[in-house]
Amino acid sequence: MSKGEDKFSSVLKLTEFDYIVPSQICIKPVEIEKSNDSGNSKIQIESDGRYVEISEDGTKKSLEKATITLNDCLACSGCITSAESVLITAQSISEFLLNVNNNNDSNNNQDEKKTIVITLSPQSRASLASHFKISTLSVVKKLKTFFKKLNINYLFDSSFSRDFSLLESAAEFVARYKKTYINNNNDEETGKLEPFPLPMLSSACPGWICYAEKTHGEFILPFISTTKSPQQIMGTLVKYYFTEKILDNNTNNNNNNNNNNNNNNSKIKPSNIYHVTIMPCYDKKLEASRNDFYNDIFKTKDVDCVLSTTEILDLFKEKEIDFLSLEEDNSIEEQFFQLSPSNQFYSINGSSGGYLEFIYKYAAKELFNVDIVEPIQYKIGRNQDFKEVSLEIDGKKVLNFAQAYGFRNIQNIVRKIKTNITTKKDTNSQYDFVEIMACPSGCINGGGQIKSDAIKENKAILLDSEEKYNENVIFRQPIDNQSVQNIYNTWLNGCFSTDSKTNLHTQYHRIEKTTNALNIKW
């Protein structure tokens, strides 16, 4: 197994078992440049490893390495993923530094200069804190110092956009539930499946989404929540809300102070932002590269570059930075950072985003006026990666939720949904919502997190990262986040509104199977 192959989630690696390495054979046809030469030639490997073509007259010609783009991989059904070296050309430290350096060189040309925003995930924050044996707050403050040295403008927290994702997911679930059980009673006579049926499957994990699109296609896609992940919601907020409401205002205020009336020419566009996220998982690079998150008008992606937690360590080495010796910068962007006045992080229970717990409590209140204030008592499956919880009223099960992490549990969920549909089982035996994550133990154990070469040490590292995730936090419900509510009121016209559905929701696409002779093993 190559060094990079364990970076992606297990569901992105095909085989019959949980952990599967990606195939080394890519079936994507490569466009071959036609040559006018009709003579015979042979291919030879040079001492330095280069492949050369030798013609009949002895002339040597170096052969170019066949390459495919990340978008090629996403649009191809030949495999679930490909090797890391194939996938990530524009999602690397070198690309990040190239953009940062180019931006610094454009200081004298304001038309070319971009505002650089970095969004940090709480899982990456916890992993770095565990690795350096410091607090998560110190991690943030030292990162702030480090990024200032690179002339990065802003450091944001993806927990902020997670609150939007939770609220939209919960409202979407309630709408589906009402349509299925209350309004139409699921149209039992015709057996017609609702356009957005139950169970609703969570959508925050890009590894799971990619797997669903390529292996189960049209059957499973209607069940998946249309709500964007926290990463992509932050991409929308940064490129559109932040640009329009904050940066534009600041620019116009500066122009007014300078008696410059040419404000229209100084309007900041989404393409003037370079947005980088730091995530626990390499699959997030796939997500950011989806065409659904590219704006043709402004020619920009919502998230321009994704760096994993481990790549931040590589970045420190590249810049010859002793992270622990960095001073701690106390200036934190209040609106887009989940930090209380007492310097504690606002959080919600669950190191993978807390979708099951939040939606379960939200639905119980909205649908049945039941307040769940006590800790949820889960029924544990064969391991901690599969949990169930249900709500009963007058002896009837009215909500049935599950959490499924890891490939095997995901397969079991998909099989159960298929069985329930084909056999038309009693709805009481079905799930209403399932929180799905590709990685065992969820996002805190993502393939991009900092791990040890000694496998036996990784369990302790995982436990410590989990502790760091819950260190120095205040649990707060997303609905109590006043900054989130302000954006809903001033920009989105409310939760799950038409504007919210336009900006905070997405769609999925069945990837057609292709037949290619290169895929045949003789």
Swiss-Prot record:
Binding site residues for [4Fe-4S] cluster 1: 26, 73, 76, 79
SUPFAM superfamilies reported for this sequence: Fe-only hydrogenase
Task: Report keywords, A-Z.
Answer: 4Fe-4S, Iron, Iron-sulfur, Metal-binding
Q: Quick one: which residues bind [4Fe-4S] cluster 2?
A: 205, 281, 439, 443
Pfam families according to UniProt: Fe_hyd_lg_C (PF02906), Fe_hyd_SSU (PF02256)
The terms describing its cellular component in GO are: cytosolic [4Fe-4S] assembly targeting complex
Q: Which domain of life, per UniProt?
A: Eukaryota
Q: Which GO-annotated molecular functions does the record name?
A: 4 iron, 4 sulfur cluster binding; metal ion binding
Q: What does this protein do, in the record's words?
A: Component of the cytosolic iron-sulfur (Fe/S) protein assembly machinery. Required for maturation of extramitochondrial Fe/S proteins.
What family does this chain come from, according to its entry? Belongs to the NARF family.
Any idea what this protein is called?
Probable cytosolic Fe-S cluster assembly factor narfl
Q: Which organism is it from?
A: Dictyostelium discoideum (Social amoeba)
